[in-house]
Design a protein with these regions (language model features):
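Gly/Ser-rich "nucleophile elbow"/oxyanion-hole loop immediately N-terminal to the catalytic nucleophile
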Residues: 151-166, 186
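Catalytic histidine-centered segment of alpha/beta-hydrolase-like enzymes
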Residues: 293-302
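A glycine/proline-hinged amphipathic helix-loop "lid/cap" segment
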Residues: 1-82, 313-336
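Alpha/beta-hydrolase active-site loop
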Residues: 134-154
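Hydrolase active-site cap/lid region
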Residues: 181-236
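Short beta-strand/loop motif that positions the catalytic acidic residue
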Residues: 259-261
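Short amphipathic alpha-helix adjacent to the substrate-entry channel of hydrolases
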Residues: 106-125
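Short beta-strand element of the alpha/beta-hydrolase
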Residues: 88-97
Length: 336
């Protein structure tokens, strides 16, 4: 039976890129510098690319911070809830970026508040534990505890614990899809949708774009290697399915996905490769490449966030999982 045209396009992209990808694995032989601190890494970027905390006074949102028990230490959750008209809200857990070693709830404020307001959802932004102080599996276990807290408190927030989505940027995209896998495997939480913005998915760094050809203004291969060394100090962890989604052979049963990649991002190939793997596993998947965007900028890009909002409105409206075989949508969007 011939492949559907949309599927063939996706597979062609993956095959072409794999031929020319450089091998960055030698970077794992480098030790972390003794003075290694997250603020040294390229995610700080240019001032123009920094995500500043949004003014939430006029967004019509009730925003509050909550402390819960995490895997290795207490963590903070930031709750964004739209003004209620009596409607029961869906739930979205959001995970900030920062390469597993930096980032904060404040960094995620623009994205989380936009999703809450425009989707009309109860959004919980998760302040998960950061490496190197708290390496894997602290972050995904924190994510799971945040999901458990959301389920336990949904009724009090007039939210529906049966309509949960997850989303994240960069390392947060990794945590979002890994949380979906953990929830599937443990069986006590059902996640209906996942939206991944420029996700950081491949600790092997064998699917990363050529740094000499993709002019990334905000992250580089050395920074990625340092982050993975800090987050996954044991080499065997770089194959764990809850740390390396692209290495997983058990993608069936994951929720429908939206994956947004940025043209000027070293990670766009692995993001699109993951989309192909999800499709092959029967997971309904939409892919959008933003051709004039960079890695950091995608987290608060209006076009990307509009796609996320539309995706969650569609996927969290129903109370049942979407049937297999949805059409893959591959788009390229100019942000200029």
């Amino acid at each position: 039976m011939p492949l559907r045209q949309e599927w063939a396009v996706s597979i062609a992209i993956v095959r072409c890129d794999r031929i020319v990808l450089p091998d960055y694995r030698h970077l794992f032989q480098m030790s972390l510098p003794p003075e290694f601190v997250p603020s040294q890494l390229g995610w700080d970027g240019a001032d123009a690319l920094k995500i500043t905390m949004a003014s939430t006074l006029d967004l019509g949102l009730c925003i509050e911070d909550v402390r819960i028990a995490g895997h290795a230490q207490p963590i903070t959750l930031r709750s964004y809830r739209p003004a209620s008209d009596g409607t029961v809200l869906p739930v979205v857990l959001y995970f900030h970026g920062g390469g597993f070693v930096r980032g904060s709830l404040d960094d995620a404020d623009v994205t989380a508040s936009t999703i809450a307001r425009d989707t009309a959802a109860w959004v919980i932004s998760v302040g998960y534990s950061l490496a190197p102080a708290f390496p894997f599996p602290a972050a995904p276990e924190d994510a799971y505890r945040a999901a458990q807290w959301a389920v336990a408190n949904a009724r009090a927030q007039r939210a529906d614990a049966n309509r949960i989505g997850v989303a994240g940027h960069d390392a947060g995209g990794n945590l979002a899809t890994c949380l979906a896998a953990i929830a599937r495997d443990r069986g006590d939480i059902v996640i209906l949708a996942q939206a991944l913005l420029a996700p950081l998915l491949d600790p092997s760094m064998t699917r990363m774009a050529d740094e000499n050809k993709v002019r990334s203004p905000d992250i580089g291969v050395t920074e990625c290697a340092q982050c993975y060394r800090a987050y996954l100090p044991n080499a065997s962890q770089r194959l764990h399915p809850y740390a390396a989604p692209l290495e997983s052979r058990r993608l069936a049963g994951l929720p429908p996905a939206l994956i947004a990649s940025a043209q000027h991002d070293l990670l766009h190939i692995e993001a699109e490769k993951y989309a192909g793997e999800l499709i092959a596993a029967g997971v309904p998947t939409e892919v959008t490449r933003h051709v004039n965007a960079s890695h950091n900028a995608l987290a608060a890009d209006p076009a990307a966030l509009a796609d996320v909002v539309a995706f969650f409105k569609k996927r969290l409206r129903a109370r049942t999982l979407a049937p297999l075989g949805d059409t893959l949508k591959i788009q390229t969007i100019s942000t200029t």
